[in-house]
């Protein structure tokens, strides 16, 4: 029996926050689509960290599920969502303010979340 090829990965970088719903929701939708058969890691920095704190606004735009709905679905699907610790601090938050399932960014995880090739997309 042959070993299965390692799954490829998708690294999605999101720096825009609630003020840009189209970019936010497109990044989350792309993570959902790719997670069907790829390993996915989302890295949120700059303004995007405000999307994954416990009191995050529920960003919406016609044609997309809301941000809170998508984030919940992604976490349930095993997508890794990491928040930049420095950006979190600058925004006035700490690790304890993150939604359950969202973690502080870990540079080692950037290189180990998948065993296959990695494609990166930036929003």
Predicted regions located by residue number:
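Loop/turn elements at helix/coil->beta-strand transitions in domains of secreted/extracellular proteins
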Residues: 7-9, 37-40, 80, 116-118
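A short aromatic-anchored loop/beta-hairpin motif
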Residues: 77, 82, 95-99, 103-112, ...
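Aromatic- and Gly/Pro-rich donor/ligand-binding loops
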Residues: 122-123
């Amino acid at each position: 029996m042959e070993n299965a090829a390692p799954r490829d990965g998708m690294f999605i970088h999101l720096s825009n926050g609630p003020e840009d719903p189209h970019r936010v929701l497109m990044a989350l939708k792309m993570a959902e689509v790719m997670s069907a058969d790829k390993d996915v890691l989302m890295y949120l920095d700059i303004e995007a960290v405000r999307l994954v704190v416990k009191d995050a606004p529920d960003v919406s735009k016609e044609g997309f599920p809301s941000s809170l709905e998508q984030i919940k679905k992604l976490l349930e699907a095993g997508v890794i969502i990491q928040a930049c610790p420095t950006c979190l601090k600058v925004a006035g938050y700490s690790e304890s303010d993150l939604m359950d399932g969202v973690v502080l960014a870990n540079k080692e995880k950037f290189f180990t979340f998948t065993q296959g090739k990695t494609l990166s997309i930036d929003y």
